[in-house]
Amino acid sequence: MSDIDVLLQETRTFPPSEEFRAGAWVRDNALREAAAADPVGFWAKESEALDWMTPWSTALEWEPPRAKWFQGGTLNASVNCIDRHVHGPRRNKAALIWEGEPGDRRTFTYWDLYREVNLAANMLKKLGVGRGDRVAIYLPMIPEAVIAMLACARIGAIHTVVFGGFAPESLRDRINDCGCKLLITADGGSRRGQMVPLKRNADVALKECPSIENVLVVMRRRSGVGDETFAEMQEGRDHWWHRLKRQVPRYCEPEAMDAEDVLFVLYTSGTTGKPKGIVHTTGGFLTGVATTTKYTFDLKEEDVYWCTADIGWITGHSYLVYGPLANGATCVMYEGAPDWPDKDRFWQICERYGVTILYTAPTAIRAFMKWGTEYVKKHDLSQLRVLGSVGEPINPEAWMWYHEHIGDFQCPIVDTWWQTETGAIMITPLPGVTTTKPGSATVPFPGIRTALLDANANELTVGGGLLAITHPWPSMLRTIWGDDQRYVDTYFSKWPGRPDLYFPGDGAKLDEDGYLWILGRVDDVLNVSGHRIGTMEVESALVDHPSVAEAAVVGKHHDLKGQAIAAFVTLRAGFTASGSLRDELRDHVAQKIGALARPDDILFSADLPKTRSGKIMRRLLRDIAEGRALGDTTTLADPSVVASLKDQYEAQES
C-alpha cells in the first residue's frame, strides 16, 4: 500500500490552562518520558495500584504475538472494584447513580453495590455456574447489568455481554460461539418511550442454544410493584432475579483468579463475517483500564463521571464499569436515548447530578450540533471540567462545537483512540499537559508505543501511512474465542515476518509536531487519480461548512479517475437541501483540501446508516453508490434509513 495523502491541515491549538495544570495528576512530561524509556516498568508500577491476593513475579512474557502479563499474580476484579472501597473511607460514597429513561432513579453506594454483587454471585452459584463457565448478559442499561458483570467476576465465571438492541439471531450466535451456560436478561427495557421485548427476543434465540441451562430474569417493566405478567416464564429454566435473591446467602467469597485468567469475552459488532469473540484477561485488563481512567480523565475523588456508552460495547466495560469503579469513582449511568423525551436530556442529567467528566461519542456530538445550542443553553453545565470523545475520529468542527458550547472554552478535550481489541485507551491527550489540536488524538498514552509504517514496515516520520502498535500492553486481547488462528491472521500478519507488530486496521497521519491523526479504516481509503485520500479528511472538510451536521464519504468506480467521491450529508437545523448548496459544498471541499477531493456526488439525507454503537456503515453506502444489492444490514440501528437512501440515490442518478 502506498502512503495516504495528507490534505487537511489544522493549525488551531489549545494548551491546558495553568489552573487546570496545577491541579492535574500529570502536569509535565516526566511520566511519559519515564514510560517511554521503560514501558514494562511503567505498567509494573501502575499494577501496584490494584489489590493482589498473590503478588505477581514476572511483569511480561512476550513471544510474539503472545503476551502474558503479571505471571504468578492472583486477584479478583470485583474485589478491586468494590470490596477494597467498602473496607475504607468510600464505603458510603455513591458508586452508581442510575437514571432510567422514564425518569426513575436509583443510587448505589459502594456498600449497596457490595451487597448486591455478593447476592448476585450466590444466585449464579445456586444455578450451577462456577469458575470458567460462560454467562451471557442481555440486559438494558440498568444497574443489574453492572451487578451481573461483577458477580461473574467474583466467582470466576466469564461474562459475555450482548447489546440489548441486538436481534435474537445475534444473541443466539454469541451464546453458541461462547458455549454459555446461563443467560441473564430482563422482561424488557425502555427506548424512546417504547418497551424493548428482551425476554421475548431471548426466548426466540434460546430455541437454538443447547448449552443454556438456566435463565435469570430481571424485572424492569411493571405496571405495579411485583407485576410479573410481562414475561412468559418457562418452568424449571427461567428464574426471577428478585425471587432468587431472597434464597441465597449474603456473602460470597471471591475467587482468586490468575492474572491471565479470562475476565470476559466481548464480540465485535461484526459488520462483515462472523463476529469475533475478543478475549480479555483479569490482571492486564484491570491494570490498563484503571490506569487510563485515572490519567486520561484526571479523575479525582470528588468527580462525578459519566461515560454515556452502552454496557454492550467495550467502552461500557472499560470506562463505565471496571476503570472508574477500580478507582472508586462516582459513575452516572443512563438507560435511554439522548433525545427522549426531548433533545436536552443529556444536559438535564449533567446539571441534575453535577457531572464533572463527560465521555461520549462524535456521533452524539454531531447530533447535538444538528439540533442547535438552544437545548444546551437551558442548563447549567458549569460543573464540567473534562470532556472526552470515543468511538471514531472526531471532525475538527465537531471538536470545536463541543469545546465552545459544552465546555465553554474551559474544559480540556481528550479525544481518545482505542478498540475493543486494545481493551483500554491507546492514543490520547493528558488534560493537564497536552496541547490539543481539534481532530487529533495527539500522542500515545504513557507506556504505549506506536509507529506509522508503509506496506514494507518502514517507519514514516511525517505524512500518512498505516498505524501499528509496536510493543505489547497489558490490556491487549489474548486471542479470539475458539479461533486462535484468526487472531494471528487478523492482527499480527499485516507485515510478513513481523509478528511483533499489531495492526489495528486504521490509517493515520503524523504531523510535524509528532501528533497522530486517525484517518479511518484502511478499507475506507479512497483512491482518486492515483492519490490515496482518507475519508476522514473529506468528511471533516464537509462538516466544516456551517450547514453540515454530519457527512460520510465513500468511493465509487470511475472510468478515468479509478474512484469518484460520493458524499452523504445531513444538514443542521435551519438549512434546506438544494442544488446551489450542493455546488457550494463541492466548492468548499475543493477550497479546503484541494480540487482532487471535490465530491462528484452529494446526497442530502435526514440520517445516515449506523450500527447500534453509532458507527457509520460505509460499506452499505458503498453498495448504494455502486448500485449493488445491499449487504448484511442486521447490525443497523434503523434499517429503514439505508433503504430510503438507496431510493433517493437511484432517483438522483437517474
Curated annotation (Swiss-Prot):
GO terms for biological process: acetyl-CoA biosynthetic process from acetate. It is an enzyme of class 6 (ligase). Transmembrane segments: none annotated. It catalyses: acetate + ATP + CoA = acetyl-CoA + AMP + diphosphate. The modification N6-acetyllysine is found at residue 615. Mg(2+) binds at residues 543, 545, 548. NCBIfam families: Ac_CoA_lig_AcsA, PRK00174.1. Catalyzes the conversion of acetate into acetyl-CoA (AcCoA), an essential intermediate at the junction of anabolic and catabolic pathways. AcsA undergoes a two-step reaction. In the first half reaction, AcsA combines acetate with ATP to form acetyl-adenylate (AcAMP) intermediate. In the second half reaction, it can then transfer the acetyl group from AcAMP to the sulfhydryl group of CoA, forming the product AcCoA. This is Acetyl-coenzyme A synthetase. It comes from Gemmatimonas aurantiaca (strain DSM 14586 / JCM 11422 / NBRC 100505 / T-27). The lineage of its organism: Bacteria, Pseudomonadati, Gemmatimonadota, Gemmatimonadia, Gemmatimonadales. The gene is acsA.
